[in-house]
Amino acid sequence: MKASRFFIGTLKEAPADAEIVSHKLMVRAGMIRRVAGGIYNYLPVGLRSIRKVEAIVREEMNRAGAIELLMPAVQPAELWQESGRWEQYGPELLRFKDRKDNDFVIGPTHEEVVTDIARNQIKSYRQMPVNFYQIQTKFRDEIRPRFGVMRGREFIMKDAYSFDKDTAGLNESYRKMYDAYVRIFTRLGLEFRAVAADSGSIGGNFSHEFHVIADTGEDAIAYCPTSDFAANIEAAEALPLIAARAAPAEAMEKVATPGKAKCEAVAELLAIPLERTIKSIVLATENEGAEPTIWLIMLRGDHDLNEIKVSKLPGLKNHRFATEQEIVDWFGTPPGYLGPVGTKKPVKVIADRTVANMSDFVVGANEVDYHIAGVNWGRDLPEPEVADVRDVKKGDPSPDGKGTIDICRGIEVGHVFQLGTKYSEAMGATFLDESGKPQPMLMGCYGVGVTRILGAAIEQNFDDRGIIWPESIAPFEVVLCPMGYDRSDMVREAADKLYAELAAAGIDVILDDRGERPGVMFADWELIGVPHRLVIGERGLKEGKIEYQGRRDAEATLLPADEAAATVTEKIRAALAH
């Protein structure tokens, strides 16, 4: 490829709406241009990287035995109504009517369509296992699209769906996809972690997320540096304390805490550790034809509520936060001074595991400007219902018993689920087993965010000059920068020869023959992030040398001109040999 015949749309400044590094650099490097909120054109530089991601994904999916197909982006509402997700999915599902007033959606995922394929095409256990996949454009109507391709509305995704006759088969399909994802993200050259996760709106029994580690990641990941444990903070278990609860040492006492509605302020006023205060969170669940059930969730003052865990508790699947009026009606006081002692109406109390182990703690007195100190279970309050309802935090014991938890940030780029029979039962996708009896198919689904990978890779690989691509997904692997290509026969001949040698070796090379000044050339290719650069100039050629600099290198080095192609080829192949 010669740069004069390619489109290079670099910019000096990032758009005002770009908040994170990847968004700024993708625009400045000429990879994307905004069409509407969360919708982008992928310009030639960006498309080259997308195609490389797709190629790696496709190779590993095929290697794992998955079979590629292509399903429509537009899906009839009837399929979504069958699965129940027409009502469940919410406003992120883009719905529309055709000219005949039929309801359709633009697919954010394809569970319904692929289940429809399976129920019509798979009749016997002999036809399984089978795993279908596609690489296709999706649409989710995000309420606030931002961060460029990281949270867009339209995006490219690889989604795969496995069908098995039994749990053993599903487990094997899941393992193959998990292993394929490890190979994919390793080949992409990314630092990543596979973490245990919640299945979310997709549903199902068992799932893992694959996160690229980056400080700007939206997701918090709990991991153990001394073991393989890693989990999304929503799914990481906070273990119960091993030590027995201490015996009461204080009498229960009402204390004045004027204007101190936060645990931190109460702890400071009373000169006690924050860990001795209780954070009271009030939830409500609806009862048809009757007043709601009010729940008091008790957390230690330095802990945070985990709503995912709460939603899995009996009776709390469809919980909401109580209104201020409900809080006043049940507790007799507005938020800030709430507690389990002396409520106006009965409430259901759930104590986090840590709270259940506390003694002589401080709670709200259900009276403005007052708290109660020295509260103890069994003596002042009945023993509570106990559950894990908090986020883990740094320093907590690891659930695998092999160290303590640390927290990092991650960008989700892949997700694998065991769906079980969620969709097959809802949509009647059955097969005849060995005895001729109909059974529901067991499903798994497996997604990779192709376009999101680009943003995540940049968040992990950049400097003040621009992107630093891993070789596997760089738009070009090496750029040739000739000094005076249009003025010097020596330079032009050497550059053309080097270009031909690299191309013959299968290297993805671009020759910058635009006639730009060296500073402009270097700035463009550093911004775009090409991993290897060779500079060809008359002075160096007279000495038999060509200048080489890797994108991560602080300084350039000189290579023998007749060895430059082989040296760079070896560097690239070594980088790709994961």
Curated annotation (Swiss-Prot):
Location of the protein in the cell: Cytoplasm
GO CC terms of this entry: cytosol
Catalytic activity as recorded in UniProt: tRNA(Pro) + L-proline + ATP = L-prolyl-tRNA(Pro) + AMP + diphosphate
Function: Catalyzes the attachment of proline to tRNA(Pro) in a two-step reaction: proline is first activated by ATP to form Pro-AMP and then transferred to the acceptor end of tRNA(Pro). As ProRS can inadvertently accommodate and process non-cognate amino acids such as alanine and cysteine, to avoid such errors it has two additional distinct editing activities against alanine. One activity is designated as 'pretransfer' editing and involves the tRNA(Pro)-independent hydrolysis of activated Ala-AMP.
Domain notes: Consists of three domains: the N-terminal catalytic domain, the editing domain and the C-terminal anticodon-binding domain.
Similarity comment: family membership: Belongs to the class-II aminoacyl-tRNA synthetase family. ProS type 1 subfamily.
Name this protein carries in UniProt: Proline--tRNA ligase
Protein's gene: proS
